[in-house]
Amino acid sequence: NGIDLEAFDVQHDDKAIREKYNLGNKKIILGLASIWSKEKGLDDFVEMSTMLNEDEVIVMVGVSEEQMKRLPPNIVAIRRTENVRQLAELYSAATAFVNPTWQDNYPTVNLEAIACGTPVVTYRTGGSIEAVTDKTGFVVEQGDVKGLLEAVRRIAERGKVKYTADCRAYALANFRKEDRYADYLKLYENITVR
Protein backbone atom coordinates (compact mmCIF):
# COMPACT_ATOMS: atom_id res chain seq x y z
CA ASN A 1 0.00 0.00 0.00
CA GLY A 2 1.12 3.52 -0.72
CA ILE A 3 0.15 6.94 0.57
CA ASP A 4 0.50 10.57 -0.51
CA LEU A 5 3.82 11.54 1.04
CA GLU A 6 3.30 15.21 0.22
CA ALA A 7 0.09 15.31 2.25
CA PHE A 8 1.49 13.14 5.03
CA ASP A 9 4.73 14.89 5.91
CA VAL A 10 6.35 16.07 9.13
CA GLN A 11 4.65 19.24 10.39
CA HIS A 12 7.15 21.11 12.54
CA ASP A 13 4.83 23.60 14.25
CA ASP A 14 2.33 21.94 16.58
CA LYS A 15 1.30 25.07 18.48
CA ALA A 16 -2.01 25.58 16.62
CA ILE A 17 -3.14 21.97 16.97
CA ARG A 18 -2.21 21.92 20.67
CA GLU A 19 -4.19 25.12 21.24
CA LYS A 20 -7.19 23.93 19.21
CA TYR A 21 -7.62 20.85 21.42
CA ASN A 22 -6.28 22.36 24.66
CA LEU A 23 -3.41 19.86 24.87
CA GLY A 24 -0.82 22.14 26.44
CA ASN A 25 2.63 20.55 26.60
CA LYS A 26 1.34 17.07 27.38
CA LYS A 27 2.70 13.97 25.71
CA ILE A 28 0.09 13.04 23.11
CA ILE A 29 -0.88 9.41 22.65
CA LEU A 30 -2.79 9.44 19.36
CA GLY A 31 -5.29 6.87 18.15
CA LEU A 32 -7.32 7.00 14.96
CA ALA A 33 -10.04 4.83 13.45
CA SER A 34 -12.85 5.41 10.98
CA ILE A 35 -15.12 3.55 13.43
CA TRP A 36 -14.00 2.75 16.98
CA SER A 37 -14.92 -0.66 18.35
CA LYS A 38 -13.54 -3.26 20.75
CA GLU A 39 -11.65 -4.82 17.81
CA LYS A 40 -10.04 -1.47 16.96
CA GLY A 41 -8.89 -1.01 20.56
CA LEU A 42 -11.49 1.33 22.08
CA ASP A 43 -11.56 -0.59 25.37
CA ASP A 44 -7.76 -0.70 25.41
CA PHE A 45 -7.56 3.10 25.24
CA VAL A 46 -10.12 3.43 28.05
CA GLU A 47 -8.04 1.03 30.15
CA MET A 48 -4.85 2.93 29.27
CA SER A 49 -6.47 6.19 30.40
CA THR A 50 -6.52 4.85 33.99
CA MET A 51 -2.71 4.52 33.89
CA LEU A 52 -1.79 7.98 32.54
CA ASN A 53 0.44 10.44 34.32
CA GLU A 54 -0.59 14.10 34.56
CA ASP A 55 1.67 15.02 31.64
CA GLU A 56 0.07 12.48 29.26
CA VAL A 57 -3.15 12.64 27.25
CA ILE A 58 -4.89 10.32 24.83
CA VAL A 59 -6.33 11.89 21.67
CA MET A 60 -8.74 9.69 19.73
CA VAL A 61 -9.96 10.63 16.25
CA GLY A 62 -13.06 9.03 14.73
CA VAL A 63 -15.11 8.84 17.92
CA SER A 64 -18.92 8.76 17.64
CA GLU A 65 -21.19 11.11 19.61
CA GLU A 66 -22.34 8.19 21.78
CA GLN A 67 -18.76 7.11 22.51
CA MET A 68 -17.79 10.69 23.40
CA LYS A 69 -20.34 10.67 26.22
CA ARG A 70 -18.77 7.58 27.78
CA LEU A 71 -15.07 8.42 27.51
CA PRO A 72 -13.12 9.54 30.58
CA PRO A 73 -12.01 13.18 30.78
CA ASN A 74 -8.33 12.41 30.07
CA ILE A 75 -9.25 11.24 26.57
CA VAL A 76 -9.70 14.05 24.06
CA ALA A 77 -12.29 12.82 21.58
CA ILE A 78 -12.43 14.20 18.04
CA ARG A 79 -15.21 13.18 15.66
CA ARG A 80 -13.32 13.91 12.46
CA THR A 81 -10.45 16.10 11.37
CA GLU A 82 -11.33 19.03 9.13
CA ASN A 83 -8.86 18.05 6.40
CA VAL A 84 -5.77 15.97 5.65
CA ARG A 85 -3.44 18.76 6.77
CA GLN A 86 -5.02 18.82 10.23
CA LEU A 87 -4.66 15.04 10.39
CA ALA A 88 -0.96 15.36 9.47
CA GLU A 89 -0.60 18.01 12.19
CA LEU A 90 -2.10 15.63 14.77
CA TYR A 91 0.15 12.78 13.69
CA SER A 92 3.18 15.09 13.83
CA ALA A 93 2.28 16.54 17.24
CA ALA A 94 1.85 13.11 18.82
CA THR A 95 4.58 11.55 20.92
CA ALA A 96 3.45 8.22 19.48
CA PHE A 97 0.66 6.80 17.37
CA VAL A 98 -0.89 3.86 19.21
CA ASN A 99 -2.81 1.28 17.19
CA PRO A 100 -4.20 -1.31 19.62
CA THR A 101 -6.09 -3.16 16.89
CA TRP A 102 -7.04 -6.76 17.59
CA GLN A 103 -7.35 -7.60 13.89
CA ASP A 104 -6.22 -5.72 10.83
CA ASN A 105 -4.63 -6.47 7.50
CA TYR A 106 -2.24 -3.56 6.77
CA PRO A 107 -3.55 -0.39 8.42
CA THR A 108 -2.92 2.76 6.42
CA VAL A 109 -2.97 4.83 9.63
CA ASN A 110 0.35 3.25 10.64
CA LEU A 111 1.89 4.36 7.34
CA GLU A 112 0.48 7.88 7.70
CA ALA A 113 1.87 8.27 11.22
CA ILE A 114 5.33 7.04 10.23
CA ALA A 115 5.31 9.37 7.19
CA CYS A 116 4.63 12.26 9.57
CA GLY A 117 7.67 11.28 11.63
CA THR A 118 5.74 9.67 14.47
CA PRO A 119 6.64 6.21 15.75
CA VAL A 120 3.90 3.57 15.93
CA VAL A 121 3.14 1.35 18.90
CA THR A 122 0.89 -1.58 18.03
CA TYR A 123 -0.12 -5.06 19.04
CA ARG A 124 1.48 -8.07 17.40
CA THR A 125 -1.52 -8.77 15.21
CA GLY A 126 -2.14 -9.25 11.51
CA GLY A 127 -0.48 -6.77 9.19
CA SER A 128 -0.33 -4.02 11.79
CA ILE A 129 3.26 -4.97 12.60
CA GLU A 130 4.57 -4.93 9.02
CA ALA A 131 5.52 -1.24 8.90
CA VAL A 132 7.00 -1.18 12.40
CA THR A 133 10.77 -1.62 12.75
CA ASP A 134 13.03 -0.90 15.70
CA LYS A 135 13.53 2.57 14.17
CA THR A 136 9.83 3.29 13.56
CA GLY A 137 8.19 2.10 16.76
CA PHE A 138 7.37 -0.84 19.00
CA VAL A 139 5.30 -4.01 18.82
CA VAL A 140 3.82 -5.47 22.02
CA GLU A 141 1.83 -8.61 22.66
CA GLN A 142 -1.88 -8.43 22.01
CA GLY A 143 -3.85 -7.24 25.03
CA ASP A 144 -0.81 -5.81 26.84
CA VAL A 145 -2.17 -2.31 27.44
CA LYS A 146 0.51 -1.58 30.03
CA GLY A 147 3.11 -2.60 27.43
CA LEU A 148 1.64 -0.12 24.94
CA LEU A 149 1.97 2.69 27.46
CA GLU A 150 5.48 1.60 28.48
CA ALA A 151 6.52 1.73 24.81
CA VAL A 152 5.11 5.26 24.48
CA ARG A 153 7.06 6.26 27.58
CA ARG A 154 10.26 4.77 26.13
CA ILE A 155 9.74 6.90 23.02
CA ALA A 156 9.15 10.00 25.16
CA GLU A 157 12.18 9.21 27.33
CA ARG A 158 14.47 8.77 24.35
CA GLY A 159 12.90 11.78 22.65
CA LYS A 160 10.49 11.50 19.75
CA VAL A 161 12.85 13.63 17.67
CA LYS A 162 15.24 10.66 17.65
CA TYR A 163 12.63 8.71 15.64
CA THR A 164 11.40 11.42 13.28
CA ALA A 165 14.10 11.24 10.59
CA ASP A 166 14.13 7.43 10.59
CA CYS A 167 10.35 7.29 10.32
CA ARG A 168 10.30 9.74 7.42
CA ALA A 169 13.15 7.99 5.61
CA TYR A 170 11.39 4.63 5.99
CA ALA A 171 8.18 6.13 4.60
CA LEU A 172 9.99 7.65 1.61
CA ALA A 173 11.63 4.30 0.85
CA ASN A 174 8.53 2.14 1.30
CA PHE A 175 5.22 4.02 1.20
CA ARG A 176 5.37 6.24 -1.92
CA LYS A 177 2.03 5.61 -3.64
CA GLU A 178 3.55 6.08 -7.11
CA ASP A 179 6.06 3.32 -6.41
CA ARG A 180 3.40 0.98 -5.07
CA TYR A 181 1.18 1.62 -8.15
CA ALA A 182 4.15 0.77 -10.38
CA ASP A 183 4.67 -2.45 -8.40
CA TYR A 184 1.02 -3.40 -8.93
CA LEU A 185 1.27 -2.69 -12.67
CA LYS A 186 4.35 -4.90 -12.93
CA LEU A 187 2.55 -7.66 -11.06
CA TYR A 188 -0.48 -7.43 -13.38
CA GLU A 189 1.77 -7.43 -16.44
CA ASN A 190 3.57 -10.53 -15.19
CA ILE A 191 0.27 -12.29 -14.56
CA THR A 192 -1.24 -11.41 -17.95
CA VAL A 193 1.91 -12.31 -19.93
CA ARG A 194 1.76 -15.91 -18.73
List where the protein language model places each region.
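Short alpha-helical donor nucleotide-sugar binding micro-motif in glycosyltransferases
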Residues: E89-A94
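Nucleotide-activated donor-binding/catalytic signature segment of Leloir-type glycosyltransferases, i.e.
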Residues: G62-R85
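Short acidic/histidine- and often glycine-rich active-site loop of Leloir-type glycosyltransferases
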Residues: K69, T125-V139
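Aromatic "clamp/platform" in nucleotide-sugar-dependent glycosyltransferases that forms part
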Residues: W102
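Conserved acidic donor-binding segment of nucleotide-sugar-dependent glycosyltransferases
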Residues: R80, D134, F138-V145, R154-K160
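A short, well-ordered alpha-helix in the C-terminal region of glycosyltransferases
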Residues: V161-N174
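Conserved donor-binding/catalytic core segment of Leloir-type glycosyltransferases
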Residues: L23-K40, V46-T50
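Short hydrophobic beta-strand element within catalytic cores of glycosyltransferases
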Residues: P119-T122
